Curated annotation (Swiss-Prot):
Fe cation 3 binds at C428, C431, C461, C464. This is Anaerobic nitric oxide reductase flavorubredoxin. In the N-terminal section; belongs to the zinc metallo-hydrolase group 3 family. One of its GO terms (molecular function) is FMN binding. Homotetramer. NCBIfam families: PRK05452.1 (NF003954). SMART domains: Lactamase_B. Keywords: Cytoplasm, Electron transport, Flavoprotein, FMN, Iron, Metal-binding, Oxidoreductase, Transport. It comes from Salmonella arizonae (strain ATCC BAA-731 / CDC346-86 / RSK2980). Anaerobic nitric oxide reductase; uses NADH to detoxify nitric oxide (NO), protecting several 4Fe-4S NO-sensitive enzymes. Has at least 2 reductase partners, only one of which (NorW, flavorubredoxin reductase) has been identified. NO probably binds to the di-iron center; electrons enter from the NorW at rubredoxin and are transferred sequentially to the FMN center and the di-iron center. Also able to function as an aerobic oxygen reductase. Binds 3 Fe cations per monomer. It is found in: Cytoplasm. Pathway: Nitrogen metabolism; nitric oxide reduction.
Length: 479
């Protein structure tokens, strides 16, 4: 099946509704993807890119239903990655002499995947042209490291279509092809997710390359990407977004993510967020448990944020493995113009937070003071967490915040009041988790200072997920 793109240009690609992993398992394609290939029929017939290798046979069969394969005059490979050039072996078995136009770097990549150095490669550079008849030409623009060394774009004169390769695309599958036909919220979420997780390391190259392309003074009526939609309605809107995202992008947003062994670091995260909100209720704060969250969503939020707070329990004197992995990935993404702070709980040894602070600094973040708590945070420790959040809110504010008078209750008074009025601590008889009325359980909307008798009946133990009926009065407090 083909879809008319414009005049003599047809989409002959492949939708992939089921794909959920990309680049191994590093990118979660929660809304599927598409592999966009385009057939141009002028006096010369041109195929731009193929599809992912797993669809090779279907692609060639579908292409044969559109055109006699022997009538294809030129093949353009904008990018040698297997989701673009994966069907070349199947196709070239049918038309072995067809010329393949690509960059010099692409020849190395294509041969590395397909092992056919005898193919008829034609090397092109920025500014080279290819006459396709009817007064139209293809103009090639090299775009190295956006996002592979072999990458290029192809511009078609006359129809003013830019075949943009990975740039301006998104992993987004829909039966409809054009940007004005699909859900706009979904579309732009996937555009930003794609940029944040794939193109962020190359942001320093995005602006000069777009400037170079604009310098050709060529009209762009349509942008035909390699993944996702074709931009036909106001195509420059995505170009403007890329320029914005490439300029050390940040919103008035703070991302907190953590991993925890006994929920202690989670409690710290919640208290820090409360402190931030007390001082700056306008800043958006998002909290993620890395063990239960989509990694790419976390990284997209980091991309959007002015700062990030990263929490970890100490395990074997180092940070939790999922935190270490995510920080390593942030190092590779090379975020700029962002601040960071490490926090976490520990028992007899607290080496993780210091290691985490060093890793975040090595990743290019401007560091603020870290915060540690020993064992499960008590009232004093929770107040320190909230104060840390207040301090962070002021330090990271994009504009000066009004001064506020913080009313505090002495810790001794709180403790006395808690002991006198809140009743005993309760212990889960299954996993031994302890409910402290003075601390509550904020993640289940049980506020600090809530007696066990007032805890909702649908309360679940944070450790073993069993209900209130498995709790007993803590033995040390039983009378």
């Amino acid at each position: 099946m083909s879809i008319l793109v414009k005049n003599n240009i047809h989409w002959v690609g492949q939708r992939d509704w089921e794909v959920r992993d990309f680049h191994g398992t590093e990118y979660k394609t929660l809304r599927g993807s598409s592999y966009n290939s385009y057939l141009i029929r002028e006096e010369k017939n041109v195929l731009i890119d193929t599809v992912d290798h797993k669809f090779s046979r279907e692609f060639v069969q579908n292409l044969r239903s559109e055109i006699d394969l022997a009538d294809i005059d030129y093949i353009i490979i904008n990018h040698a990655e297997e989701d673009h050039a994966g069907a070349l072996t199947e196709l070239m078995a049918q038309i072995p002499d067809a010329p393949i136009y690509c960059t010099a770097n692409a020849i190395d990549s294509i041969n590395g995947h397909h092992h056919h150095p005898e193919w008829n490669f034609k090397v092109v550079k920025t500014g080279d042209t290819l006459d396709i008849g009817n007064g139209k030409q293809l103009i090639f623009v090299e775009t190295p490291m956006l996002h592979w060394p072999d990458s290029m774009m192809t511009y078609m004169t006359g129809d003013a279509v830019l075949f943009s390769n990975d740039a301006f695309g998104q992993h987004y599958c829909d039966e409809r092809l054009f940007n004005d036909e699909v859900d706009q919220t979904e579309l732009f979420e996937q555009c930003q997710r794609y940029y944040a997780n794939i193109l962020t390391p190359f942001s320093r190259l995005v602006t000069p390359k777009i400037t170079e392309i604009l310098g050709f003074n060529l009209p762009v009526d349509m942008i035909a990407t390699s993944h996702g939609v074709v931009w036909r309605d106001n195509p420059t809107q995505i170009v403007e977004l890329y320029l914005k995202w490439a300029a050390d992008y940040q919103e008035d947003r703070i991302t907190i993510f953590y991993d925890t062994m006994s929920n202690n670091t989670r409690i710290m995260a919640d208290a820090i967020a409360q402190g931030i909100n007390e001082v700056d209720p306008n800043v958006a704060v998002k909290i993620f448990n890395v063990a239960r969250s989509d990694k790419n969503e976390i990284l997209t939020n980091v991309f959007r944020s002015k700062g990030v707070l990263v929490g970890t329990s100490t395990m074997n004197n180092v940070m939790m493995p999922k935190i270490a992995g995510l920080v390593e990935e942030m190092t590779g993404l090379r975020f700029r113009n962002k601040r960071a702070s490490a926090f976490g709980s520990h028992g007899w040894s607290g080496g993780a937070v210091d290691r985490l602070s060093t890793r975040l600094q090595d990743a290019g973040f401007e560091m603020s003071l870290s915060l540690k708590a020993k064992w499960r945070p008590d009232l004093d420790a929770l107040e320190l967490c909230r104060q840390h959040g207040r301090d962070i809110a002021r330090q990271w504010a994009l504009a000066p915040l009004p001064e506020t008078t913080q009313k505090t209750t002495p810790a001794e008074e709180i403790t006395t009041c808690a002991a006198a009025d809140l009743g005993p601590k309760m212990q889960c008889s299954v996993c031994q988790w302890i409910y402290d009325p003075a601390l509550g359980e904020p993640l289940q909307d049980v506020a600090p200072g809530t007696p066990w008798s007032d805890v909702p009946d649908n309360f679940l133990c944070p450790e073993c997920s069993l209900g209130k009926d498995v709790f007993d009065v803590l033995a040390t407090e039983a009378k």
